[in-house]
From Swiss-Prot:
It is found in: Host Golgi apparatus membrane. The chain crosses the membrane at residues 20-40. One of its GO terms (cellular component) is host cell Golgi membrane. Belongs to the alphacoronaviruses E protein family. The keyword Membrane applies. The gene is E. It comes from Porcine transmissible gastroenteritis coronavirus (strain FS772/70). Homopentamer. Interacts with membrane protein M in the budding compartment of the host cell, which is located between endoplasmic reticulum and the Golgi complex. Interacts with Nucleoprotein. Residues 1-19 are virion surface. This is Envelope small membrane protein.
Amino acid sequence: MTFPRALTVIDDNGLVISIIFWFLLIIILILFSIALLNIIKLCMVCCNLGRTVIVPVQHAYDAYKNFMRIKAYNHDGALLV
């Protein structure tokens, strides 16, 4: 089924409508992401998420960094054979 030629403004096979729908989808995803970030911030403020989750994770990461630290090469302490 084709539309009458009188109703066709631009014969682009739906490209313009497809682009408009993609932009709407991108805008909706961006707004959803912003809302999700604001909900996470609200949980951090109201539920003390920062103290119960983030601080222990930071301590564990600091312990991992200290464990994985490699001492620098010392020229004077090198043993030449």
